[in-house]
Amino acid sequence: MERAKVDFLRAASHELKTPVTALNATLENMILGVGKYQNYATYLPECKEMVEQLSGMIHEILETSKLNLTAEAPKQVDVSELLAELCEPYQLIAAAHQIMFSLDLPEQFPATLPAGPFSKAVSNVLANAVAYTEAGKVVSVYMEGRSLVVENECQPIPDDEIRRLFEPFYRPDFSRSRESGGNGLGLYIVNTLLTSMNIPYSFAPMKSPPGMCFTIQL
């Protein structure tokens, strides 16, 4: 556990270094009046945007660093009801990007689990699925036996890349850039939470239709 914390903090420090360096260089050039940086009207808004990105990153890092600090007691929940609530915002996001979102749940699905951490883990799985699905493709959420399945149609990810996706701040070549919202923490958070709850999961490519399938065993 301590090694994992050290690795996370090392990765976080490295991740923050680049935007801090860029912001410092931009401000320094503005102060010195170097070339194009004399145009404050252009570069002050850019600096503000960098600060907002840094603020968001720091918030995510702090929230992620606290994942293992508290333990929520398991309780009886209706997973179907919980999933319907969790999926609602992602259905709206999907619709806005012309992505079809299929939700097929039983009327009730009782389970005993920590609702807060489980909800956060599933939300990150859903966010990841919608983020990497192109317009005209489908995200499907359904129960299969005692398993929650989240599928999204996309270019399947190679096995050697899948393992690294659960490392903090890892972004493969096909991943979105930081500017478009990806921070490389989503699946790291999923792994941390599900592992802490002793909930098995798998993340594997699909052949037909091509895509990825995230399965959580309840």
Walk through the language-model features, giving the residues of each:
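Short beta-strand/loop element within the Bergerat-fold HATPase_c
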Residues: 136-147
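Short helix-loop "hinge" at the ATP-lid/N-box region of the Bergerat-fold HATPase_c
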Residues: 129-130
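Short conserved segment of the HATPase_c
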Residues: 157-171
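Conserved micro-motifs of the catalytic ATP-binding
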Residues: 68-75, 110-115
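Short alpha-helical segment of the dimerization/phosphotransfer core of two-component systems
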Residues: 45-54
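Glycine-rich ATP-binding loops of the HATPase_c
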Residues: 198-206
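Conserved catalytic submotifs in the C-terminal HATPase_c
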Residues: 95, 100-110
